[in-house]
């Protein structure tokens, strides 16, 4: 029974009671009415209480039923939601898989397209490089043809001038031949006349007369030969030196550079003598590791606040100096740290060498050098010859060769290039077998240098065999740079031995009284005995001494031979 039914029942009972009271009101008394009313109320309360209890039971059952329905609905909703979520996940996974597949396919297509594009770019780049190289080759060939044409034109002009000089010389020889024939006829007649007079006056035999005449002729011819040699040498000097002195003087006046003597020991200052123990390390492990990694002897002696680095390889010595200074600055000195710092110093040294090569090329006005050649050029900064820095010497030779080439109407840039690279073989002559000339030729050919540069490297010590004028210019510039006072130095022992050898060669000739090597071995003054050496023989003697010095000795620059003949006439007035 529902709550609405209970309420309706109570209303019906109430109305029934009221009607009953009205109907029996007249017959019954008020007491009975009250009793009936009270009974009706009790019954109504009982009914109401029962209705309430039933209503509570119904409500509780309804709640349980609603809860069960709610749980069932929630379970169905949860199941539906999980089913929907599973479906959504499945669809999402399928969509993601499809999208991933499409992305992979698109990535593969993009990668393939990129590879094709990269290959196309590489092909275009290679074609551009080939085109550039072909243009450079054609440009070089045109330049070579132009230079060859200029050389042929100059050679033709020189040949024409030489032919003209030869014709003049031939005519002069014909005239001299006629004059000599006439002189010979005159001498023959004079000889016959002298012979006849000798026979008549002296009563000499023909053999004795012939001997006297031959001795006289020998003396006259010897005097004439000496005079002609002296005159020819003077003419050659005047003609050959006049223009050369002008060019060399201009070049030397326009060029001035410093020189530097390279030692085999580097001094590194340290903060205090206490640092020497840290440098040595426990049981000498630090110093052994340092020497093994650098190849340089680390000398720690009683020198206050300094240590010495000794090595005949200047690059290794400089790397060791940089590494040691970094270790002293950092304060951490142990084998692993030493290895790290030495490797860092080696990398910095490579950069430093390349920068020195670039600076040298820039200072010499040479462009277009390959990076490998610039690196080799920078190594010359640490190379010395007779105490002269080879890189500075090469720069100076480049300037001198360029100046002289400009004066002669040649390619100054090419001359500077040849001068700068003429000693390039000295950069690796300690690591590679062969002379610095042979190594330099191989390097120049490997880096594609012009033929003139290769020829200058090959013949800068023997210009007589050179094929181009640039080799002659480089040889002259090399001699100028090396012959400057103070440019090069030798050890004291070699210096003294060279001076003694110069004096010994001069004293070995007959008629020489004494000899002095002066001007740091660049001049030999020879004092001869006047009664044994005539003025004519003095010139021949100077030439013979110079020739023997050239054959038997090695020396930088040139040596001047001066022969002094002094005749003294002494008489006393009594």
Curated annotation (Swiss-Prot):
Keywords associated with the record: Cell membrane, Endonuclease, Hydrolase, Membrane, Nuclease, RNA-binding, Transmembrane, Transmembrane helix
Domain HD: 390-483
InterPro entries noted in UniProt: HD/PDEase_dom, HD_domain, HDIG_dom, KH_dom, KH_dom_type_1, KH_dom_type_1_sf, Ribonuclease_Y, RNase_Y_N
Keyword RNA-binding assigned: yes
Leader peptide range in chain numbering: none
GO molecular function annotations of the record: RNA binding; RNA endonuclease activity
Gene3D superfamilies assigned: 1.20.5.2950, Hypothetical protein af1432 (1.10.3210.10), K Homology domain, type 1 (3.30.1370.10)
One Gene Ontology CC term in the entry: plasma membrane
A Pfam short name: KH_1
SMART domains per record: HDc, KH
KH domain mapped to chain residues: 264-327
GO terms under biological process: mRNA catabolic process
Domain of life where this protein originates: Bacteria
TM segment ranges: 1-21
Enzyme Commission numbers on file: 3.1.-.-
Compartments where found: Cell membrane
Membrane topology: Single-pass membrane protein
Cell membrane listed as a keyword: yes
Similarity-based family: Belongs to the RNase Y family.
Protein task: Endoribonuclease that initiates mRNA decay.
Listed name of the protein: Ribonuclease Y
Species of the source: Thermus thermophilus (strain ATCC BAA-163 / DSM 7039 / HB27)
């Amino acid at each position: 029974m529902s709550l609405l039914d209970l309420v309706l029942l109570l209303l019906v009972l109430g109305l029934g009671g009221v009607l009953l009271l009205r109907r029996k009101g007249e017959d019954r008394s008020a007491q009975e009415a009250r009793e009936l009313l009270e009974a009706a109320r009790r019954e109504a309360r009982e009914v109401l209480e029962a209705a309430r209890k039933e209503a509570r039971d119904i409500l509780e059952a309804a709640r349980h039923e609603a809860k069960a329905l709610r749980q069932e609905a929630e379970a169905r909703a949860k199941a539906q939601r999980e089913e929907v979520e599973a479906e959504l996940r499945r669809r999402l996974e399928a969509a993601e898989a499809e999208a991933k597949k499409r992305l992979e396919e698109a990535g593969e297509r993009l990668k393939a397209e990129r590879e094709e594009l990269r290959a196309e770019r590489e092909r275009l780049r290679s074609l551009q490089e080939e085109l550039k190289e072909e243009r450079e080759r054609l440009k070089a060939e045109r330049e070579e043809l132009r230079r060859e044409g200029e050389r042929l034109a100059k050679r033709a002009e020189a040949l024409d001038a030489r032919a003209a000089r030869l014709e003049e010389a031939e005519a002069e020889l014909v005239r001299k031949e006629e004059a000599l024939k006439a002189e010979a006829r005159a001498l023959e007649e004079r000889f016959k006349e002298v012979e006849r007079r000798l026979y008549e006056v002296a009563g000499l035999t023909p053999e004795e007369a012939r001997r006297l005449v031959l001795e006289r002729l020998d003396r006259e011819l010897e005097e004439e030969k000496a005079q002609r040699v002296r005159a020819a040498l003077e003419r050659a000097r005047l003609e050959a030196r006049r223009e050369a002195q002008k060019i060399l003087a201009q070049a030397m006046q326009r060029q001035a550079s410093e020189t530097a003597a390279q030692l085999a020991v580097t001094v590194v200052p340290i903060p205090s003598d206490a640092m020497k123990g840290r440098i040595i390390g426990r049981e000498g492990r630090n110093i052994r590791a340092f020497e093994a990694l650098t190849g340089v002897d680390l000398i720690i002696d009683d020198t206050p606040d300094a240590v010495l680095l000794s090595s005949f390889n200047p690059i290794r010595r400089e790397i060791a100096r940089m590494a040691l200074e970094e270790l002293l600055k950092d304060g951490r000195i142990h084998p692993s740290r030493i290895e790290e710092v030495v490797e860092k110093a080696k990398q910095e040294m490579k950069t430093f060498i390349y920068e020195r090569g670039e600076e040298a090329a820039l200072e010499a006005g040479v462009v277009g050098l390959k990076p490998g050649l610039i690196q080799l050029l920078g190594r010359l900064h640490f190379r010395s010859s007779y105490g002269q820095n080879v890189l500075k010497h090469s720069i100076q030779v480049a300037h001198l060769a360029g100046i002289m080439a400009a004066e002669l109407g040649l390619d100054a840039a090419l001359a500077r290039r040849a001068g700068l690279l003429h000693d390039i073989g000295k950069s690796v002559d300690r690591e590679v077998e062969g002379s610095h000339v042979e190594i330099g030729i191989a390097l120049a050919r490997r880096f594609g240098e012009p033929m003139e540069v290769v020829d200058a490297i090959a013949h800068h010590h023997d210009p007589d065999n050179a094929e181009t004028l640039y080799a002659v210019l480089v040889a002259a510039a090399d001699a100028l740079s090396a012959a400057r006072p103070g440019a090069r130095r030798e050890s004291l022992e070699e210096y003294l031995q060279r001076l003694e050898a110069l004096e010994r060669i001069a004293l070995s000739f007959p008629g020489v009284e004494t000899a002095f090597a002066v001007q740091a071995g660049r001049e030999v003054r020879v004092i001869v005995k006047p009664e044994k050496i005539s003025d004519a023989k003095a010139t021949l003697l100077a030439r013979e001494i110079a020739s023997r010095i050239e054959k038997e000795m090695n020396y930088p620059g040139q040596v001047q031979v001066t022969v002094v003949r002094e005749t003294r006439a002494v008489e006393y007035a009594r």
